[in-house]
Amino acid sequence: MTHKIREVYIVHHSHTDVGYTDLQEQVIYNQANNIRRAVELIEEGLEKGTNQKGLKWNCETWYCVEQFLKVATKEEKKTFFDLVKKNSIGLSANYLNFNDLADCEYLTEKIHDMQEVCAKEGVTVKTAMFADINGISMGQRDAMLANGVEFLYTNIHTHHGMYPLYQNQKPYFWENEDGKRLLVWSGEHYNLGNALGIVFNKNVNFMTENYFGKAQGDVAGPLEKLHSNLIASMEEYEENGYPYDFYITSVSGVFSDNAPINPAIADTVALFNEKYGEEVIMRMVTLQELYDLIRDKVADAPVYRGAINDWWGNGVGSTPYAVKHYKEAVRLNRICDRLEEKTGVHNAELVKAYGDNSLLYAEHTWGHSATVTNPYDTMVTNLDMRKNSYASKAHEAAAMRKNEQCHLLGDILRYYNLSGKVKAVSTSHEKRVFPVEFYVETMSLPAVKVTDDKTNEVMEVQLSTHPRGVLVSFLAEFEPMEEKTFTYEEQPAPAHTLFTRTAWVGAERVRDIINTYDTESYKLPYGMENDSFKISWKVGEGITSFYNKKAEVEMCRPGLETFFTPVYECTKIRKGVYEERRLIGRNIRGLHAEQYQGDLKDVKVLDHGPVFTRVELVFDLEGTYYSSVIIKMYNKLPKIEFSYHIAKTLSEDIESVFLPLALNLPDAEVSIRNGGVTMRPGIDQLPGTNMEYYLADEGLIYRTKDQTILVNTFDTPLLYMGAMESHPILLCDNREENNKRPVYSWIMNNTWETNFKMDLSGFSEFRYGVEIVDNGSVKEGMERLSDNDKGVVTFICG
């Protein structure tokens, strides 16, 4: 039989997992050595004229090249780049295989640095590849486009995931909002070549059996088996309308991640071509060669815009406490970028320490392959600790950078004076009223007067408790990026005597009588209200109303979608911790999953003053030792801040904890930022992509014809959209109705059976904010959401 496919292009690489197979440092060391070994083998093949002269090696991630260049001799570096120019070694502009936590601003700089390093050697990198991961953010795409990358070769692993466009081995152009395009070849699994038999494996692997069935007494040799597997695959392609005369496959040196180069592949290619070359030719290629070979043949590929939404983003929910720490590191870095606009001082060393560690944390691997099946193993613990250290080191550098910036702006680094001066710095490019808060480390500060030094306005102040003393809060209006200085002065304690001529409070000091003297206190056990919002609750029933007074709309939704009310979900283990999780596929729960909604048991009024009111709603919730939502409502701002306090218990079951963010706004359009690029979930995506859950940079916005409602998710990026039950998975079809599904903050989960943690136990708070603003553009809403994330920087300056 004559086949249309005449050439097989083989991309030999090592899939970069910083972890998974071994300790991170060992993996990094090994990957640098893989490149050194590739240089040696290819050079030897060229010198001796052996089959290895045709050996090609592709560096899947630039990070591994970066590590090699750190340890390589001058001669090794020269030889390496000579082989790149000879198309014996291929380079990829993919820095690491990320999830959507990656800081794309810093990533853009790293890819720029890569191009500068290569340019000095006479090389321009126009290609990139990723393997295993189920997508990259639009911000990562734009980081590549901004640095001259033209071609991306993808190798998606469909374990709990799927490739886009309903089909693999398919080209398309991925276009951004500026009209720039990246040619993408959406390939097969990165071990397809191993499954075919390009690398002989005595132990038949599961992928070969998945693709080609189990051997039935077949005693054919390795070369013959490779031929029969390849022909079977080619026939499948051609029978299904595959239009090209080439076939692309990746291959690893062994069937494993972080695999070394395998010189035997060049021998296999030579032997195959000698025996079967008249039928089909095998050819090892670099990424640049692959791009050159196919680009004209796929010039008519379709053009798409939107996200390749990452199926593996849910893994970040397995480490909610470290992710919270990481999110604050990113926030601190963004704040420092704004403060630098004022100081003009740039600490490149701290920026690099933050950035390099933040990218290592956002690398997709997370933990050891036995994280779930053997959580007791020392290596599992070591990888987990090391992974968390990347977030911590990023946070350390960003926090130190903020200390320096504040000191330059006048921070006296002392918090003890009961009277002094405080500076507040807006990080917003918009004129706005912001809450301003600072604390004084003291046992007692009975009252304080705060005066705006510029206007002499006496601010309305509220004092409340702080873990280290007394918190001082007030509201102030700021011009864009304005620094304001305030004088604060200790005052005598106000006299606390009860007004006794009106029936409003009894001798036991309980304020529960409806009256006109104090029109707020008697309502607080049942709800809270300002000019924009009214929230009502009832012990035993929960939240009964979340009313938008400006739009005159009841925003509270029924059932599990009720705002401010945590939800715990559990799929009991019946078939073992691994198998039960494997069976959920692309769902996030099993068929027998059960949901438990928080049962409101108590209400505590924590603060009530002229600036804000703060109330704690205490819930009984399965899967937790303690569960409460603390709501802080500002009296004179259309703004609410709330935090979920959780003491999570330990379980081997498949668990998730959610906080509903669904609002009864049927005509609203929901938008998020993903890698710095705005998108509408369910709409602005490539067809056939994941629309079950998303990673959002700073939260989401609901945009109606009259208002924009901003919902900040400060500490937890994962959003789930849709039904709270196991269901057939609908891949994205870009319909408007996809954007109308209920939204939940998916705080934590342990749905994976391999490298993402099963243990969710711990204490923490997860913070959120809701603000109503006049309707503007989506861009304006997103900028304000980002401003809310950064807030005002305040410190004592005198």
Q: Predicted segment positions?
A:
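Catalytic and substrate-binding regions of extracellular carbohydrate-active enzymes
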Residues: 198-201, 348, 360-646, 760-764
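Acidic, His- and aromatic-enriched active-site or binding-groove loops in soluble protein domains
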Residues: 74-93, 142-184
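CE4/NodB-like, metal-dependent polysaccharide N-deacetylase domain
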Residues: 107-146, 232-249
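Active-site and substrate-binding clefts of carbohydrate-active enzymes
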Residues: 5-17, 21, 168-413, 427, ...
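N-terminal catalytic cores of secreted or lumenal carbohydrate-active enzymes
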Residues: 1-101, 118-119, 173-177, 331-338, ...
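Mature extracytoplasmic enzyme cores
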Residues: 1-11, 17-18, 25-28, 34-38, ...
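Beta-strand/loop-rich accessory regions of lumenal/periplasmic or secreted enzymes
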Residues: 14, 147, 155, 278-279, ...
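The substrate-binding groove and active-site-proximal loops of carbohydrate-active enzymes
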Residues: 14-33, 60-70, 92-107, 123-134, ...
